[in-house]
Regions:
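ATP-binding/phosphotransfer module of carbohydrate and carboxylate kinases, centering on a glycine-rich
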Residues: 1-47, 51-54, 176-322
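Short, acidic Gly/Pro/Ser/Thr-rich loop/turn segments
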Residues: 13, 68-70, 142-146, 201, ...
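Active-site nucleophile and cofactor-binding loops and adjacent substrate-binding regions
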Residues: 34-36, 76-79, 98-105, 125-127, ...
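Short beta-strand-loop/turn "lid" adjacent to the catalytic site in phosphate-handling enzymes
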Residues: 53-99, 104-117, 268-273
Length: 322
């Protein structure tokens, strides 16, 4: 059957028509992007997508949102839209739907995508286990964390708030970074260190350590300089970011008993060329007495361009295969 997959973030809402069968995604059509600022609600963005098609809309929806999905009213993060689940069928003119957290959708994508969509980062270059736990984590605007429990009968995605565990500094530079962040936040979570906006605090901490006066820049400007190799301090901040991502991914894998780790998130693909040559793998494995165990865990980067859309469709497929 066909389903309209929707991935709603703070800036954009992405739409695509997916075909699902037997609990899995068969295909995902071309992506259409609607800016959330151009629409008062999901309903009007949905109608704009429908108007762009030369065919009727499927009467099923798979919707991923940047917010917890429980309750009668869903307020999206960094987005003024409000979604009332009880009104979705009426407002969108669908017969059935699935509503899922956006990183839960990434978990479903990771569970269903072929191995071709994963880039090996460290650990053994082997396929993921078909039985046991996989950890999924991904830096974007925040730090998303999910688990995938693989069984002989399929899989189950467990949504978590693992991005909000406490940050643990591992060297003097990170001690300084933590001290800086504590001036603003009483409690410093890993999301303050391993998410897109965190690059600002890392950059400014390094500048302070080196005694350099730097212009106040936003995270987008620093990321651009770092990824284009235009500024040595921005590059150093990027290296530091990768170190922290490796440490956090390793902590999560250790805590969750993971047999594999998947890196995703809005920054994942942008870091593709940098992670492998940074200190990510060393920090991931550096867990004291458990180093040997950590070195045996395959760590891969998800490379699908639209894991949120694919995962929303996958969640619908799994739900309606029962």
């Amino acid at each position: 059957m066909e389903v309209v997959a929707v991935d709603i973030g703070g800036t954009n809402a992405r739409f695509a028509i997916a075909e699902v069968a037997d609990g899995r995604v068969v295909s995902l059509g071309e992506t259409s992007m609607q800016k959330t600022a151009d629409h008062a609600s999901l309903q009007t963005a949905w109608q704009a997508f429908a108007a762009s098609l030369d065919r009727p809309m499927p009467r099923a929806a798979a919707i991923a949102v940047a917010s917890p999905v429980g309750g009668e009213l869903i307020k999206l993060t960094n987005n003024p839209w409000i979604i009332r689940p009880a009104l979705i069928k009426e407002r969108l003119e669908v017969d059935e739907y699935v509503l899922i957290n956006d990183f839960g959708a990434v978990g479903h994508a990771a569970a269903q995508l072929p191995e071709d969509y994963f880039l090996h980062l460290c650990g053994p270059d082997t396929p993921f286990t078909k039985q046991g736990m996989l950890t999924v984590c991904g830096p974007g605007t925040g730090l998303g964390v999910a688990q995938i429990l693989c069984t002989p009968d399929g899989y189950h995605v467990i949504e978590t708030e693992g991005g909000h565990i406490d940050f643990a500094p591992l060297d003097a530079i990170e001690d300084n970074l933590l001290k800086r962040l504590r001036k603003t936040y009483n409690r410093v979570s890993t999301e303050r260190i391993v998410a897109g906006p965190a690059i600002v605090a890392i950059y400014e901490t390094l500048a302070e350590i080196e005694g350099r006066a730097v212009q106040r820049l936003d995270d987008k400007a620093i990321w651009l300089m770092a990824l284009e190799g235009k500024d040595s301090l921005a590059l150093a901040a990027l290296d530091r970011f990768c170190l922290s991502l490796g440490a956090v991914a390793g902590d999560l894998a250790l805590a969750q008993g993971a047999k594999g780790v998947i890196i995703a998130g809005g920054l994942g693909l942008r870091l593709k060329d940098h992670l492998a040559r940074s200190g990510f793998s060393e920090r991931f494995a550096a867990k004291g007495r458990f180093r040997t165990m950590m070195e045996a865990i395959p760590v891969k980067l998800i490379t699908h361009p639209q894991p949120g859309l694919f995962g929303a469709a996958a969640a619908f497929a799994q739900e309606h295969a029962r």
